[in-house]
């Protein structure tokens, strides 16, 4: 799959990335080669391959879930720019 320069600019815009005109060609080649590789992987027949949850089939010993740090929520929220009902308020970044 070959991406055009306009495709790269659109992807960069959607991802909120600044891409210079000098870099568009290199990004188009790199992204196109990645998409070509994905197409090759999709062509592989995996109908009879059992799905794996994890490549190593071993049991993990888990440690006890114990509090190891003091609760400093009030201290951290006192220095935060904006807090409401115990939650941190941040600027909207997604339109």
From Swiss-Prot:
GO terms for biological process: glutaminyl-tRNAGln biosynthesis via transamidation; regulation of translational fidelity; translation. Its EC number is 6.3.5.-. It comes from the Bacteria. InterPro entries: Asp/Glu-ADT_sf_sub_c, GatC. GO terms for molecular function: asparaginyl-tRNA synthase (glutamine-hydrolyzing) activity; ATP binding; glutaminyl-tRNA synthase (glutamine-hydrolyzing) activity. Disulfide bonds: none annotated. Keywords: ATP-binding, Ligase, Nucleotide-binding, Protein biosynthesis. It is an enzyme of class 6 (ligase). It catalyses: L-glutamyl-tRNA(Gln) + L-glutamine + ATP + H2O = L-glutaminyl-tRNA(Gln) + L-glutamate + ADP + phosphate + H(+); L-aspartyl-tRNA(Asn) + L-glutamine + ATP + H2O = L-asparaginyl-tRNA(Asn) + L-glutamate + ADP + phosphate + 2 H(+). Heterotrimer of A, B and C subunits. Allows the formation of correctly charged Asn-tRNA(Asn) or Gln-tRNA(Gln) through the transamidation of misacylated Asp-tRNA(Asn) or Glu-tRNA(Gln) in organisms which lack either or both of asparaginyl-tRNA or glutaminyl-tRNA synthetases. The reaction takes place in the presence of glutamine and ATP through an activated phospho-Asp-tRNA(Asn) or phospho-Glu-tRNA(Gln). Belongs to the GatC family. This is Aspartyl/glutamyl-tRNA(Asn/Gln) amidotransferase subunit C. It comes from Thioalkalivibrio sulfidiphilus (strain HL-EbGR7). The gene is gatC.
